């Protein structure tokens, strides 16, 4: 007779969860940040709000963003004027867009990841799909399963409305799935489209305007599994440890509410201050067991909520400017793509490390950290181990 403990042992993988492939995708419509205020105030019929436009111009100038990608083109916005007003009932219109576009963009990223992985898609055992852009039944996970032609018995997990920290959440969940299910290959997809949050400017709600200056569209996909098959699967990063915590005294720091007018976004407190205040504790918990206390000796992937968060974290930890290079590069080229951002940064880091001839995927360093920040205020921490190039 076989014991339960023997069954459990046989069910578990031996090695750590490993990122085996990364793919990214964006809509074709590229928006230049320098000219965006003119476009935004024109398309929303708000050109008479001269002072507000000047404020928005300053926000865009200080954002450290050069460009973003958006599904919403001038043509789409002209056809759907309710989306351009500040709080006009427009949820139906927005939903009709995102329930199609979110899985479609996710598919584009997933196809790239599967191609890099080099294995048949029939070997995918689990799917994690994450979006803060719209809600539907059956969900975006189901739609993606159909679009990709995955097996009907793939084990699916749908994460709706998590917000900007969720790039860390999907890695945490993928790690647990890969390590506890021998031979599992998890397809992870984060797909975000700002059609749910786009709206005209308001004199009284400047936090909404901050979102209009920062958010962009993008999807990222990973293949995660333990015990990579030698010569066939090529490891990129290993995931060693994960944690999630709610920062103390941070209730209401970042809120999002699904309303008739779409997803409304609220920044109620000093978010950069809360993040920088709590980052030390998160790092000690993560790296003390590894005897690492010099945070310049590790590689960094942080969700770029905005430049102020990165500036304050750098200052608090006395980080060298190059530590946030990959993070700032992604913010500059794509804006804040919510949950997809940290996965884009993983991709940017491994590509630049290889291009520069460095020894590992993590800028030549062995250990690294990935941080997700978002509503709650919730902090996700992932300890990464790089792979030799």
Curated annotation (Swiss-Prot):
Record keywords, A-Z: Acyltransferase, Flavonoid biosynthesis, Transferase
Catalytic activity: (E)-4-coumaroyl-CoA + 3 malonyl-CoA + 3 H(+) = 2',4,4',6'-tetrahydroxychalcone + 3 CO2 + 4 CoA
Record carries keyword Transferase: yes
InterPro entries reported in the protein's UniProt record: Chalcone/stilbene_synt_C, Chalcone/stilbene_synt_N, Chalcone/stilbene_synthase_AS, Polyketide_synthase_type-III, Thiolase-like
Pathway(s) it belongs to: Secondary metabolite biosynthesis; flavonoid biosynthesis
Gene3D superfamilies: 3.40.47.10
Any one Pfam family match given in the protein's UniProt record, by short name: Chal_sti_synt_N
Listed EC numbers: 2.3.1.74
Residue numbers annotated as active site: 164
Domain of life: Eukaryota
GO BP terms in the entry: flavonoid biosynthetic process; polyketide biosynthetic process
Protein name: Chalcone synthase 1
Organism of derivation: Cicer arietinum (Chickpea)
Gene that this polypeptide is encoded by: CHS1
